[in-house]
Structures are given as structure tokens and as C-alpha cells.
């Protein structure tokens, strides 16, 4: 009798779930593709000499409870205000003070979508890459919101992500994926197919051009200080590349990053700051290498089970040639989407918390140590 119940238990709680899992795998139409080897390279080649691996130890939190997932940050020096976009559709303005507790948060403009990338136009307007709306122009101190573009070459944007503004007024931006929306980001990464595009919009001619296509989740964009090229990031590839505007050619800027890049910001002082939404873990690398693991992960996600976890996020400082200088990260940190240096502080946006994270770089400098 004990043997009978033991066998039945084994059948119902082991064999049946296994058979159901196999059936779900076979029937699911999600079809991940093999990806280039850069996506699962085991080594981190871009290792900076200076490391700060306890970012949260000295961190301050700005706008706690008032900034719901502030994804990108733009700083307006004349007014000493930070502009950031939140998940509730609000572009908010935050005053910058020596004390984080003195910061004041203002609901400025609601786009009715999900504002992500933010930049300032040449005439003082605020340009917003809205994940659902497209590229927006906010002018008249927030009184007027205009849609600039939401499609290119007959293909609608699915995930307008980041925008950078050239000195001549041309806007450069990414549609991270023409197939998946913001709520489906994980499936774009797991599918392993290049759905991203780098584009430009000329406000004078109103023409939208596709500069590059077939990018792997095209994310952050930054204009070079000499205005000759852009730096753009491909998140799953762990690399950032240069796009030369006049020559229309591409070359690698930095690769083998310690994490998965999101936004990239130039600080006006010879450095770019690359946000890492998560560190590069062994589990992530294995999943990128083997499509069947990505399919299992995607099926689980459809049923509300997360098999992939994000941790050890941070911000990498590099010079104009892509040489790594310092890395500020923390094992407890995740979903960091933006890093921008304002004065002596590093401000970080994210898609997890209800605040902006700030670190005093003079009080908590990176030190010489191994990554």
C-alpha cells in the first residue's frame, strides 16, 4: 500500500507537470533566434581601473514617493531643474539642492503616454521620446505639446525610447523595437531578433529618416561634443557603437561591458556615463547562448513566473574614445536606466523605484580595485 501511494504521488506531482511543460513548450509559437556571440561572451573586456561596488552605501534618494519610475533625466542648468518622465505619464520637474530633502517635485506636463527619453531643443523646448506616443515637442513652458513623428518608412514606432539633439536642431532617437511595446520588452530581448532602429527627425523639413535598422534593442543615444557622430547602445549585445553622421558608417565604441547598457549621457567634461540596467550574470549569458532556455523563460513569463533576475546595476564612466574610467555599481541595485553627472553628484534614473538615486562622487569616490 505505501508503495502504491508513493507511485501515484510521483506520477501526479512529477510526471504530469513534466508532460504539461513539454506540451506547453511544443505548442508555444514563441521562436527565439540564435544571437551573435557578443551577447553571451563570458568575459568582461571593458574593465575600468576605478571601482565603487557599494553604490547604495552613500546614496541619497530624491522625491521619494513622488517620482514613479523616473526613467531618464535631463538637467536644465539655467533654472537648476531636473526633468524626468514617470510611468504615470507625467514629465516632472525637480529642483536641485545640496540637501536631497530640500528637493521639490512639480507635476509639469502629462503626455498621456509613457515619457522615456528627455532632451532640450535648441529653442528651449523639451523633446520627449514617449514609448507610446512617439517623438513629442513640449513648448510654451508646458502649454503646448506637439507630436513630431510616430512612424518611419511606413512602420509605426512601437517603443520610442531615447532622444538626443544636435546643435543644428536635428533630433536623433531610437525606436527600441518595431515589434514589441514597452510592456513586452522582455520578449524582444528573449526573442533575440534585431527589431531596433536609429533615426533622425529634421524639424525644418519635418522628414524622419531611418539611419540604421536591424539593431538589437536600440537604446541610449548621445551626440558627440564635436557633433560628428552619435553613440548608441544595444542592450543585449553589451556594446555601444559610433554612427558617423556624414559618412553614414558604424564602428564599435565600447563592447564587453560589465552589464546591459541603457541610456548614455555626455557630461560636457570629456566623459560619457553609461547606465547598466543589470550586471552581466552567468544565467543571463547562458540564456542568450541557448535559444531553448530563452523560450522556457518566455513561456514562464507569460504565466507570471520570472526566471531571470536583474541585479548589480550601475553606471560606467568612459572617456571620448570609449576607454573605461570608473564603474559605480552595487549587487543590491537593479533597473538603473540613466546616469548623469550634475556638479559633484551622480544622479540615476530607474524603472523600479519611486525616486531618483544620487551619489556624492567626492565623498564616495571609486577606488583602484578589481571588478
From Swiss-Prot:
Domain of life: Eukaryota
Signal peptide positions on this chain: 1-23
Sites bearing Phosphotyrosine, chain numbering: 303
Induction note: By salicylic acid (SA), jasmonic acid (MJ), ethylene, abscisic acid (ABA), dark and infection with the fungal pathogen A.brassicicola and cucumber mosaic virus (CMV).
Localization per Swiss-Prot or TrEMBL: Vacuole
InterPro entries given in the database record: 6-blade_b-propeller_TolB-like, Strictosidine_synth_cons-reg
Protein name in UniProt: Protein STRICTOSIDINE SYNTHASE-LIKE 5
Lineage, uppermost ranks: Eukaryota, Viridiplantae, Streptophyta, Embryophyta, Tracheophyta
Gene: SSL5
